[in-house]
Each structure stands twice: as C-alpha cells, then as structure tokens.
C-alpha cells in the first residue's frame, strides 16, 4: 500500500495515519483469528470461546496459535520468522491494547489517547504493519499447506487400508 503513494506528497496524507493503523491492526487480528478457526485442532465452539474471550488481544491470540496450531503442523515456535512475528505482535499489542486508540480519539473517561504530539514516519510504520500482516499470512499459508498434506496422507492411508 505504501509504495502506491507519491513519495514527495506524504504531508497531505496525515489524515490517513489513523485509518491506516486501524486497518492494519484489524487485519492482524483477523488473520490470527483465521488461523485459529481454520487450522486449530479445537472444536468450533472452543475456538469461538477463545476468540470471544480474547476479542482484541493480539498477544493472547498468538499464544493460542503457538500452543494449539504450531505443534500440530510441526511449525517450530523458536523459528526466527515466527519469533519475529510474535515480537511484532507484542509491539503492536502494547501500543494499542484494546483496539481503540486508532478508532477513537478519546477513552471511556473522555481523556485523549494521544496527549502529546508525536511524529511517526508514515512510510516506516506502514511498512512495519504490512510486514507483520504478511508474516502472519505466511504462517497461515504454511499451516494450511501442511494441513492439506496431512489430509492427503490420511486419505492415501485410508485408501491403502481399504485395498
């Protein structure tokens, strides 16, 4: 997304900062939930319970993936790729714990979330968020690939046993 904008004209895009951050954060959350629904060994009602009790908690969702998805498909949680994805999830989660900083200007007590004027590098932050989404999508794709292979092996075995 970031590459599509004119590098010289980022000053006019300051109004895009919060929507960009919100959309990427929401994408990260939905990708994690997708992994849980599609690749977890839990029953659908158990997955729904996990997702409902951890609605916007990116770190908790990633922990459930580490415990309930990665071991099934023999994905190593100590792999640098997965460790970095988890570290990036922690960074994003610690900045926006309940998915409201980018959605609303104030909290429930009518206090502004951003009291200080901070300057963020639009391109760097966008690249960071996009990389995180791509990393989680990569984990999902690898788990799906391995899930398909296991299903194919099971079908071959069942076919072999029937003959």
Model-flagged regions — what are they?
Residues 1-163:
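Domain-scale activation on soluble regions of proteins
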